[in-house]
């Protein structure tokens, strides 16, 4: 199973950006970003916004998993 929150947190760290930075990009408080890190799943609209903010296609993770399982 993909834990999307962990993947988002890892990518944010890889880019050397903070939760506060992502919060500003998403117009939410950094405490909400920390809650996102703990989520195993996420709303697609929110994932799209995060993908755009980080310039990273998190949907590809699901696509790769789907292809591997077929």
Regions found by a protein language model. Give the residues of each.
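Short C-terminal boundary/hinge segments that cap the last helix of small helical domains
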Residues: 55-70
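Key DNA-contacting residues within the recognition helix of helix-turn-helix
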Residues: 34-35, 48, 62
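Recognition helix of helix-turn-helix/homeodomain-like DNA-binding domains
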Residues: 27-42
């Amino acid at each position: 199973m993909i834990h999307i929150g962990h993947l988002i947190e890892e990518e944010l760290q890889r880019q050397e950006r903070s939760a506060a930075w992502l919060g500003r990009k998403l117009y939410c408080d950094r405490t909400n970003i920390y809650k996102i890190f703990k989520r195993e799943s996420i709303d697609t609209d929110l994932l799209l916004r995060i993908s755009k903010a980080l310039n990273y296609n998190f949907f590809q993770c699901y696509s790769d998993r789907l292809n591997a399982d077929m």
